[in-house]
Amino acid sequence: MNNTECLKTFKINGIESGYNGYFKLDILKYRHSLYRGGSSDTVSRELFVRGDAVVVLLYDLSKEVVVLIEQCRAGALMHAQKIGQNEQAWLLEPVAGMIDFQETPQQAGIRETKEEAGVEINELEYICQYYPSPGACDEILHLYASEIDASLLPEYAGFDTEAEDIKIVQIPFEQARLKLASGQFNVSSTIITLQWFFYQKLAQLKA
């Protein structure tokens, strides 16, 4: 352990609620150690309290397809409107969803796959976990993959009660790889899971 690591300490001085609805916004006040010694002044940051989520990339080795879901996403609406391209509000992503209280990431992945892709899975292969936006959000994404029989997939899925309107999209391996290499995917979980699949999973299978 070096000296820089020894200095990494912090103290949370207060947490105030800024908003408490479907999502939460807290105002976090804290101090932390400095690289050059001493402590920072009190830092105040608005923190989007979202909780952890799970992501599951589905694939079918026999059909040589990866499976993504397409849906209209609130986070993409404003940019799509700004550039005058409505279709840009529809994004291609792996199955994903929030992890419920007292639920493991694996349990959430199995549940979300049934809800969003209409198929049952029993096994998940761990990919990684990461913070998608650590400067303002506490969310951690837990990424997994699962092999399925793509012939069992419906064309559409989603719960009406959750305003979900989902299209199931099967993309041939080579087409998905080329889209990935040319920067045509614009969601971090899509990019990371596909990079793992093509450059680690398939590479191991071919070795």
Predicted features and spans:
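Conserved Nudix-box catalytic region and its N-terminal flanking loop in Nudix hydrolases
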Residues: 45-48, 65-111, 160-162, 166
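Hydrophobic pocket-lining residues within nucleotide cofactor-binding pockets
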Residues: 61, 99, 121, 148-149
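Acidic, metal-coordinating catalytic segment for phosphate/diphosphate chemistry
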Residues: 20-65, 71-79
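Active-site-adjacent beta-strand/loop module that shapes the phosphate/pyrophosphate-binding cleft
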Residues: 30-34, 133-154
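Nudix hydrolase/Nudix homology domain
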Residues: 2-14, 70, 83-90, 101, ...
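A mid-sequence, solvent-exposed acidic-amphipathic segment
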Residues: 114-137
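Short, well-ordered beta-strand micro-motif
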Residues: 27-29, 58, 145-147, 170-172
